[in-house]
From Swiss-Prot:
Family membership: Belongs to the YbaB/EbfC family.
Highest taxon of source: Bacteria
UniProt-recorded name of the protein: Nucleoid-associated protein HSM_0308
GO CC annotation: bacterial nucleoid; cytosol
InterPro entries per the UniProt record, alphabetical: YbaB-like_sf, YbaB/EbfC
Key words of the record: Cytoplasm, DNA-binding
Length: 109
């Protein structure tokens, strides 16, 4: 199935990809992404590991309905998570560029 050098080359490629993925995952965990809701009145900043780093609430919202404020915070957090996931996909795509992976192959991230 594999030639003499084919399997060794495949294993070497897999090891290199694993090392690059590990490095990229460490870099991604350090990056920060900000999600917004309410036209920027609520901002939630998370890191690449989806840990919340900061929540900014415009002072004008402090007088408003508590339930609306909670909804906006949740929406901003969800927006931040979506942006973080998009960033992760872009960064990890650079790791696998040039590799002959089968169509539809899902990376473990």
């Amino acid at each position: 199935m594999f030639g003499k050098g084919g399997l060794g080359n495949l294993m070497k490629q897999a090891q290199q990809m694993q090392e690059r993925m590990q490095k990229m995952q460490e870099e991604i965990a350090q990056l920060e992404v900000t999600g917004e809701a309410g036209a920027g009145l609520i901002k939630v900043t998370i890191n690449g590991a989806h840990n919340c780093r900061r929540i900014d609430i415009d002072p004008s919202l402090m007088e408003d309905d508590k339930e609306m404020l909670e909804d906006l915070i949740a929406a901003a957090f969800n927006d931040a998570v979506r942006r973080a996931e998009e960033m992760q996909k872009e960064k990890m795509a650079s790791v696998t560029a040039g590799m002959s992976l089968p169509p539809g192959f899902k990376m473990p991230f």
